[in-house]
């Protein structure tokens, strides 16, 4: 048999063995926007980008979208307009994003606390609470100076207070995932497993 003879026999069979398995496995997870919620430093943006890549979905970061809409950074919005103005802009931006085709959306730590936003997310998307120990989150956020809520303060104290205030709202997320101090792709696999179980 010549090389030319072999090509028609083997090539058509190779693709169906792999592609449909991946497609069928992940297709249900692509049907709705996946919204990541949780405290600052838990990895919503970094893990979210990788999750979007695995699913073949666009990635959106609500904080970046708020900055683009306001024409200034989150820190500037907090300093010049105050937190209430930021939260109002955040709510409107998330509502707009939820009307877009399915994507992975990373939200700010306080977004899901807003009852209106929380209800809208749970209605139009799949909400995923990423959770990790406060001490771990404090170590992460202390490495950067771009978090207005912890700048110049004890991050453990701030995050502990935020956890007490926000966890009841986060608990209303449809999927809960403990991420811990793991590589980003391990967290992605944990999210995918939890999403599959939720769709089962």
Swiss-Prot record:
Co-factor note (free text): Binds 1 Mg(2+) ion per subunit.
Primary localization class, coarse: cytoplasm
Protein task: Catalyzes the specific phosphorylation of the 3-hydroxyl group of shikimic acid using ATP as a cosubstrate.
GO cellular component, one term: cytosol
Residues that hold substrate according to the record: 63, 87, 109, 166
Record: residues binding Mg(2+): 45
Species, as recorded: Caulobacter vibrioides (strain NA1000 / CB15N) (Caulobacter crescentus)
Encoding gene, per UniProt annotation: aroK
Subunit structure: Monomer.
UniProt xrefs under PANTHER family: SHIKIMATE KINASE, SHIKIMATE KINASE 1, CHLOROPLASTIC
Subcellular localization(s) per the UniProt record: Cytoplasm
Name the record gives this protein: Shikimate kinase
